[in-house]
């Protein structure tokens, strides 16, 4: 009798994606983050669904509805904090996943990489809108500052901002539409993730050595299913440690104060996972220049296939490029730190130097390092 999973049309798709999928035998734990992102997405959709059942997207009641969820709803506090800290875990996995793609040259799979970039932008948009929903001080002023950046676009900027706001300031209309978008976008992310997987399975996974692994493949199940389950258990352990011991560690105390348009917080800053981009934005005194730098700080990843000058796929055998990647990581951590600091000396100059360094490493140093390594190997 033929195996059910190989004959049933629906099970055949699952089988070819997660069971009988030929996978390289040497992929490391850096390849775990794709499945961890899937777990984060499912967790965020489920917790978000239960939060949406009790949340009201009205400026007068939004903040108190979040307090009501935490105080009066059965296990509402754990759902709320799992959702808030789940977003942080999502971005940790996302940054690791993109970093692995950069290090091991996964950007050579053009379709997979470009859909991954769309996924990154969509996830960032979703997280930003989610941060506005509790309608605390940081929610309100964060929304005001970030949406206002669009006014830097020549000719249409001001009209565009008012169109997004649904009025002349961030108000009820803005909150309602942000809630609507925040609810629908995760489902769009799910669809995009499926397309991402579809294109990945057309080419097969990359591997640390960057050498084609067609001659040495193993089935995905049980080898990598077990490995992924271990990763998932560790992810959930870290998330629950955060939720149960320090739920507000990554949040901002200002967001427990209900939004007040007449009182600006001393330091307006986004969630920690946007701080690096925020630091790049602030490092340029001109508004339009800052906005362009902000967009380019993420969009630069789309250029990675064009900037790839090495004759090798992976950085496993490229010591100079390896050093540059870790300098880039240190630079991003510096930018994240600067993004959370007030705009004063010496933070301004550190932020400007770190921003210049960020673009310099990616656009100049890495292609030059690859060319040097090619010449050293007489290629």
Swiss-Prot record:
Top-level lineage group? Eukaryota
Q: Where in the cell is it found?
A: Mitochondrion inner membrane
The record's free-text note on cofactor binding = Binds 2 heme b groups non-covalently.
Query: Which Gene Ontology CC terms are recorded?
Result: mitochondrial inner membrane; respiratory chain complex III
The biological process GO terms on file are: mitochondrial electron transport, ubiquinol to cytochrome c
Q: Which UniProt keywords apply?
A: Electron transport, Extinct organism protein, Heme, Iron, Membrane, Metal-binding, Mitochondrion, Mitochondrion inner membrane, Respiratory chain, Transmembrane, Transmembrane helix, Transport, Ubiquinone
**What GO molecular function terms would the record report?**
metal ion binding; ubiquinol-cytochrome-c reductase activity
List, separated by semicolons, the cofactors it needs: heme b
Q: Where does heme b b562 bind?
A: 83, 182
What are the TM regions of this chain, as residue ranges?
33-53, 77-98, 113-133, 178-198, 226-246, 288-308, 320-340, 347-367
Q: Binding positions for a ubiquinone?
A: 201
State the family named in the UniProt similarity comment for this chain: Belongs to the cytochrome b family.
Protein function: Component of the ubiquinol-cytochrome c reductase complex (complex III or cytochrome b-c1 complex) that is part of the mitochondrial respiratory chain. The b-c1 complex mediates electron transfer from ubiquinol to cytochrome c. Contributes to the generation of a proton gradient across the mitochondrial membrane that is then used for ATP synthesis.
This chain's protein is named: Cytochrome b
What is the organism field in this record? Myotragus balearicus (Balearic islands cave goat)
Q: In the record, what lineage is assigned to the organism producing the protein?
A: Eukaryota, Metazoa, Chordata, Craniata, Vertebrata
